Amino acid sequence: MGTNSYSLKMYNPGSSQRIVFLGIITSVVIIFLIRLFYVQVINESYSVSATNNVLRYITDYPARGMIYDRKGKIVAFNQAVYDLMVIPKQVKEIDTLEFCKLLDISKESFIDKMNKATSFSRMKASTFEKQISAESFASFQEKLYKFQGFYVQPRTLRKYPNNTAAHVLGYIGEVNDELIAKNPYYRIGDYIGISGIEQSYELELRGQRGVRIVMVDVFNREKGSYKGGIYDTIAIAGQNLVATLDADLQSYGELLLQNKIGSVVAIEPQTGEILAMISSPSYDPNLLVGRVRSKNYGYLLKDENKPLFNRAMQAYYPPGSTFKLTNALAALQEGIIGINTSYPHSFVVGSKSIKCHPHPPIALEGAIQYSCNPYFCNTFRSFVDNRKYGSSENGYRLWREYQMSFGVGKKIGVDMPHELKGLIPTVEFYDKYYGKGRWKASTIYSLGIGQGELGINPMQMANIICIIANKGYYYTPHVIKQIGKYPNTTRNLGERHYTKVSAENFTIIQDGMQRVVEAGTARIARFDSLVICGKTGTAQNPHGKDHSLFVAFAPRDNPKIAIAVMVENAGFGATWAAPIASLMMEKYLKDSVKRHDLEERMLKGYLLPLQNKSLENPGLKVKDSTSVKPKNKKDSSVALLNKKKK
């Protein structure tokens, strides 16, 4: 068999022909694909260039979602403006004098803006002039063809038609480099909500931007979409929001607080919907819109009256006598006091005596009616120093837990930015300050009447009144009830938050609050035959005149509104806070106000320092926190006045 292995192979001429044939077919296909690419891409690009057309990528900014009040009234909408864009490489010789005249800018400004645009990119578009109004754009548009390399970018800006609710609605501003680095969605020139609803609901309001590719001729005129718009993306408008606010009530409350410093928060107890949230002094939200936004923001920021400061959620105040209600509720639940527990008109601590107006021993309902300091100082002492807890530290720790169940000393989850939790000191705080085992209720007794080291904001005060109105629970206070066509379900708003106090213990508290309005310290708050439950307060202020406080809800049997009013440096709660709250409740429940004399007195009231009368935006330099430390280690209540706190 010695045949060579190569002899087994046979020559087949057909195989070689097949390879040649396949090679020809492959070459034809490759040539066809190259030609197709040339015809569809390169040749079209040459065609665009040959006719002096260029491609321009234009961002389509979505319309920001509108905001309505609870009755369907628009409180925030959009108006058209135009940004003038520039691509430096495409700019040819232009008549800069005419250009500057049309835009009402100087030649120096023109040069500066061009240098900035070139520094950013010679090839990419950047903003040359922001937010040109529709009126100015109309005259400029006719001559835009003369200025090659420039084009107009349509967009919208906010408009707030009622000129109110600045702290609730918030404002928007341009994103900065830091924000862009954190969130890849945003690009240079985008706007974002910075405060209020605009910030909290940015994702729902902003929508989704789109991009159009258009052809532009040598005369700077758009000649239509590139390739029929197949590469365009459509902008998606933001979702509309329905707020819980009553715009009329909000405006009325702002009017009543004019020339005063303070806050009002009104909530619907049965839902947690915020009906009004007012911080005074305030500002017109339209000041922070448009080309003058930066200038106006600088003015507001430097204003010593701090109009940008949201006192409703960020200011700490001693709650004063309004805090007696939660003090009593904790003691009732623990069996420390009963509805018939009585106490005389004097409370003695060492050599000090805290007195009320002379009266025989009174029970809880009467103590609430007459705001008896000795009664509630004793209630606090009886709780904290009670032997069944083993020590004053344990008693105070439990008392503090009760207060926190009312939303004190913690964030209650409002759907607004910058909520502060307030202040209610811990056992560790007092141990550190006085020394462990060296303090007891008599050292910090002023907490029992809402003084001392307490700091609560008006939102928390209003929420406490919702709890009392509901007999033991609250819904998370919120400002948005509907997103698009659907209820707001983003924050479990329908969930009830219960306190540590049983429902039956609230009846006696409501009885006492009703007597406050009908025959006690807040008779001025009565109107019609409506049953109102309220409590006045006069909170000591270490920096000046006492603060005026009033909290209330109405009607008693079917609460529709709970309200907290704080007027700084205004004295007794019945003088200013109670009338303002009463007028707002009347406005909301009756839709009109009949007590015109009282209304006129509140409107004319000027409670600001005389030296500020000349200011455009009058107000008072706010104290960011009234959570003062004890004045000495012997007695944190040394400043407590021997007078009845109304």
Predicted regions and their residues:
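Periplasmic/cell-envelope proteins involved in peptidoglycan metabolism and beta-lactam response
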Residues: M1-S294, Y316, G395-S405, S446-G448, ...
